[in-house]
Amino acid sequence: MTRRGEMLDDAWYMDYAAGTLKSEGEDVLVAAHVELSDEARGRVEELEKIGAALLMMAPENEPLPFTADDLLAAEGALAPLEVGDVTRHEAYVPQALGDFLQRIHKTIRWEFLGPGLNKAMLWTGPDGEKLWLLKAQPGVAIPQHGHNGSELTLVLKGSFWDGEQQFCPGDVEYADEAAAHDIRIDDGGECICLALTRGKLRYDNPILKLFQVFTGL
């Protein structure tokens, strides 16, 4: 599967809970996703509960007698975790992202990306990984594109459609090199997303390929 809407695979939540995600960019985006999504937060708490239970079963000073697959298999033995409602702030910037920007002394500066589109570059990793914001006006159709790498997209405000699937605040979409986006912003209001991109976007349109030199994406 090249794309999975709304939630990530469990491996992402396990790595987040264990503090073993691959980069600061992944840490920030997944933390923001968990902050905004009751379902994601509940999943992390379930996995933490499973891990804690299995750790208590491990003999002292011996290797852990279970693997990541064992954690997932043990899930059915535990009662479901109830997740209550969480008060949301009006601002579109989640605390996880705000804390990160404050720590690296970065402010959000919007730049023109195209008609009805603005971007704000936030962070670049040592391998060229980019964390950035996209702001799109209602009804805008984003040019069809693919990826020469991977991308995580988290909705902070508003909503968009990728093909027949809608993504709303707290939802996250993962795309790899096999995915092709056909994105349209909902008519109800502007949409702001946090994206983490590895590799450049891939366009078939030669004009967009030329414009890509100026966007840095």
Task: Identify the residue ranges that each predicted region occupies.
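Amphipathic alpha-helical interface segments
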Residues: 195-217
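Charged, low-complexity intrinsically disordered boundary/linker segments
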Residues: 91-125, 129
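Ligand-binding loop in jelly-roll beta-barrel domains
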Residues: 179-203
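Short beta-strand His + acidic residue motifs that chelate non-heme Fe in jelly-roll/DSBH
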Residues: 142-144, 163, 181-187
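Positively biased amphipathic helices and basic secretion/translocation or surface-docking motifs
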Residues: 1-8, 24-28, 32-38, 42, ...
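Glycine- and acidic-residue-biased ligand/ion/polar-headgroup-sensing regions
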Residues: 137-140, 146-162, 169
